[in-house]
Amino acid sequence: KFDSNGPRYTSYPTADRFVEAFNAEALRTWLAKRAVGGVSKPLSLYFHIPFCNTICYYCACNKIITKDHGRSAKYLKYLAKEIEMQAACLGGSRQVTQLHLGGGTPTFLSHDEMRELMAAVREHFTLVPNGEYSIEVDPRKVDFETVQLLAELGFNRMSVGVQDFAEDVQQAVNRVQSYDETKLVIDAARATGFKSVSMDLIYGLPKQNVISFNRTLEQVLAISPD
């Protein structure tokens, strides 16, 4: 069962659906089909923030490695236009029960940029009060004030990147992150009212072994993620 590769499913539509024949008109046709049977069905939205300060060697996501925050400002300008166009195509009721910010590193955005993005979302979509609003967080670039802002903007679920706490593994994959700074972010999330906090781990990384990964699991259990 687990001795062969499976599809890498991260979002819908999956990347292999975006072929040359899939043009703007095809997208509009897809979106128009939502009206069939009523437009009251709730939506799930995914926003991709591709920017990262440094590269993690294991990462296969669509990413842009840069320390130039001017690039994210330009990206948000076009993302706001895309939000407006998608909302117009969907028409009717645009109630959202799930929203997720992934990347890349969503917290690459400045506080003002994060406010700008969520204002654009709320201008064109209705986020229901009891929805699930999630964001991926890099503990190396987040402080209490950032977590507090995310809570104020309506986020209630946080996914914290860890992968492994073993220092030699972290060095091998170019992602050095201490247990303490990880715990600080998770404690901040709980203090500011996040309903759920998860932690991402990867097995099969360079330098890992059963003993070291078991130690990482024990540290994760000590934090007690949801």
Q: Can you describe what each PLM-predicted range is?
A:
Residues 47-63:
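Local cysteine-cluster metal-coordination motifs and their immediate loop/turn environment
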Residues 1-43:
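Flexible, acidic/Gly-rich N-terminal and inter-domain linker regions that tether
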Residues 37-39, 48-51, 92, 191:
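Short glycine/proline-enriched loop/turn "hinge" motifs that connect secondary-structure elements
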Residues 44, 57, 133:
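Divalent metal-dependent hydrolysis catalytic cores, especially in the metallo-beta-lactamase
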Residues 14-17, 55, 64-65:
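A short secondary-structure junction motif
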Residues 63-92, 96-226:
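Conserved non-cysteine loop/helix-boundary elements of the Radical SAM core domain that shape
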Residues 43-44, 98:
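Structural motif
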Residues 45-47, 160:
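Short beta-strand motif preference
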